[in-house]
Amino acid sequence: LSFVDPDDYVHPEYAGCMKEALEKSGAELVYCYAMDIWASKGKSHTVSTETGEITVIPMNQYDWFEEKTHAVSWGVLYRQEIAKNILFQGNLKIGEDTLYLAECIHASRKIARVDRALYYYYINDDSVTNGRYSEKKLDELEAWRCVCKVFEDVPQVQRSAQAGYAIRCRLIAIKYCKDDEFMAKECSKVGTEFRKGAKELMKRWLQVGRYGTFLKTLYSYYFWNSWIRLKQRRKTYEVEI
């Protein structure tokens, strides 16, 4: 079983390569890397080095913080015995794919990763995930809270999910800090949620030597409102964590 978003497409070798990786690894699911495509900018990017190497990850070592970790349901091939008993949460408009993947991972013994960019992900500025602010944009944070709960019995994985959740809180705040409705109703709440996973996030930044990012995260932890004002004063910027 595999999912492809209507806006995206896959490499002609996607099915064969993923099936081979699943069989060789003995894993319950396998994921590949995405080729991110900004059609409006004529840019593309992937973290894949295209070696085709297959890496096997035990479920209790899955790291939601690590750069090469997968966090969405597409670009994955699932064994039927895992996927058939797990449903998408219909109450979530954004993030339901992340939660679905998390539940499948939790039900697995092993996860495999193949180092090829076989999934072509089109980034649309007007999509549900992007576009202007609405209250449903915060569904992504609810999904990540649920991901953290899924791994309550696997502390190491849960801590990595908490770091991932803190990152999403900061990204949501950066993206919508110039929206009046977001600032009036949700910004303070998002800051409170960010702090729940911020210490784990800062620990991770130090572990990987991202000292500048650690200091930025530390500043936003202690001075959330001041950090938001700094983001608001920027006329244009790339979304950064």
Show where each model-derived region lies.
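Membrane-interface aromatic/basic loop that binds lipid-linked glycans or pyrophosphate carriers
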Residues: 27, 178-241
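Amphipathic alpha-helical repeat scaffolds of TPR domains
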Residues: 163-175
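Short runs of predominantly hydrophobic/aromatic residues within well-ordered alpha helices
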Residues: 101, 140, 144, 162-166
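Catalytic core of nucleotide-sugar-dependent glycosyltransferases
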Residues: 117-124, 131-158, 172-198
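Donor-binding/catalytic cores of nucleotide-activated saccharide
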Residues: 6-112, 119-136
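Structural motif
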Residues: 153-164, 206-213
